[in-house]
Design a protein with these regions (language model features):
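Histidine-rich, glycine-flanked metal-binding segment
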Residues: 1-9, 14-59
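C-terminal cap of metal-dependent C-N hydrolases
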Residues: 329-332, 383-449
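Metal-associated gating/positioning segment near the N- to mid-region
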Residues: 55-120
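His/Asp/Glu-enriched, well-ordered alpha-helical/loop segment
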Residues: 206-227, 231-236, 286, 307-314, ...
Length: 454
């Protein structure tokens, strides 16, 4: 980082924060938000003044599920390229997942990732420790202050981290006093679906991306999620279900109590909110994700749950693969794709089309990830908090184009789509790291610190 962080005065921006939208000035100094007021006059001529008239000023987005592919899969992406894509999209903090090579299933391997991020990350960072069938002692040693969460793959996905021993899963729920998170799909159901479809189609080579939601079906998701949620209720564990993809699963989650009082929580991802099975004909493997993108009814149910409180956070599951890998035949193409650079504009566009208040998007992408994970002094525009902010121009449409993407994979399922709002400028810890389409200064990310309160 720079030896000293510049002082910025953002004038006349419209703040979208804590359920309100209002015009104010914001003073950033020493990497923190020093003051928020109706009108602030510069104290001296060293203050850099940013004119925010007509623009929205939001807390930096906290993306609580990303896969940045380092170590071991760095031809797809790495901590530098993908965190740069993050800040270009207004994402100032992220929680990265353990399915790298090697998988981050020990604290030693996890600390190596922290050390690398400290050198190169443009955004603030933390990492989840991966659970296996046999590493419960390591999981128990993970600090709730320094490690984001314990990640369980209850259904197979990229990497080799499947936790398929019921006794091991139950021990984790009962004995590990940490935030538990999970990818929930029932492996036997998916295997049976795959075998049946291969037989029906006359061979695996005849399967297409449109078969993905038939293999990774509603039944597979609900069986796994419902078992895990029942176990969490029985044991009293703090449990968060990643990328809920079906309307049926939403019935597992409580909308009646405040997030701060919930122990069982749910995430929806941008791609499940945007796309449906009707898009496979056009996009094919580009929208092959695990869990699968499902029906229009599922997508619409997830959208409704953004408003009623059953969905607590929105994340990306940003998971880059090369376009060459995605263009293989369906059964050989990996699942996942890059989304992080366009996630905030996409969600603001969705809000605009569905008449959802932008303040609700800020809650789901900024405030509530901070509350759920207990991230200290981030996720809100508050005096004294770290100066992680994003300035958005709501009246400057842009069309997603591959050459403008910073992800190493250089493609997006959103290519060709036009969004009404674009990210103009991003601050991380008080430093401008992105402005008008280009990275600025140098990586400024810091390690996230957690205060769970339990």
């Amino acid at each position: 980082m720079l030896e000293s962080t510049p002082t910025y005065l953002i004038k006349n921006a419209r703040l979208v924060n804590e359920g309100r939208s209002y015009e104010a000035d914001v003073l950033l100094s020493g990497g923190r938000i020093e003051r928020i007021d109706d009108r602030i006059s510069p104290k001296n001529n060293t203050i850099q003044i940013i004119e925010g008239g007509g623009k929205l000023l939001l807390p930096g987005v906290i993306d609580s599920q990303v896969h940045f592919r380092e170590p071991g899969l760095t031809h797809k992406g790495d901590l530098s390229t993908e965190s740069l894509a993050a800040v270009a999209g207004g994402v100032t903090s992220y929680i990265e997942q353990p399915n790298t090579v090697p998988a981050a299933t020990t604290l030693k391997l996890l600390e190596a990732k922290f050390a690398r991020a400290a050198e190169v990350s443009w955004a603030n960072y933390s990492f989840s420790l991966g659970a296996s069938n046999s590493n419960i002692d390591e999981l128990k040693r993970a600090s709730k202050r320094d490690v984001a969460a314990i990640k369980m793959f209850l259904g197979s996905s990229t990497g080799d981290l499947l936790v398929d021993d019921p006794a091991a899963v139950e021990r984790i729920f009962r004995e590990v006093d940490h935030q538990l998170i999970a990818h929930c799909e029932d492996e036997p159901t998916m295997r049976a679906n795959l075998e049946r479809l291969i037989e029906e189609r006359g061979g695996r080579e005849h399967l297409t991306a449109a078969d993905h939601p038939l293999i990774r079906s509603e039944e597979a998701c609900y069986l796994s999620s419902s078992r895990a949620v029942a176990l969490a209720r029985e044991t009293g564990a703090h449990f968060h279900v990643y990328h809920v993809s079906t309307g049926k699963e939403l019935d597992l989650f409580d909308a009646e109590i405040p997030l701060a009082e919930k122990k069982i929580t749910a995430e929806a991802c941008v791609h499940h909110l945007w796309f449906s099975d009707e898009d496979y004909a056009e996009l094919g493997n580009r929208i092959k994700w695990n869990p699968a993108i499902k029906t229009v009814a599922d997508r619409d149910a997830l959208r409704a749950a953004l408003l009623d409180g059953r969905i607590d956070v929105v994340a990306t599951d940003h998971a880059p693969h090369t376009l060459e890998e995605k263009q293989r035949m369906y059964v050989d193409a990996p699942s996942g794709g890059p989304l992080i650079q366009n996630s905030l504009p996409a969600m603001l566009e969705l809000a605009r089309r569905l008449d959802i208040d932008f303040a609700r998007i800020v809650e789901l992408m900024c405030h509530q990830p901070a509350i759920l994970f207990g991230i200290q002094e981030r996720g809100f525009l508050r005096e004294g908090y770290h100066a992680d902010l994003v300035l958005v121009d709501p009246h400057r449409p842009y069309t997603v184009q591959a050459p403008e993407l910073f992800t190493k994979s250089q493609w997006s399922p959103f290519e060709g789509r036009t969004f009404a709002a674009r990210v103009s400028q991003t601050w991380v810890n008080g430093l401008v790291v992105y402005r008008d389409g280009k990275p600025r200064n140098m990586p400024a990310g810091q390690r996230l610190v957690f205060d769970r309160g339990w």
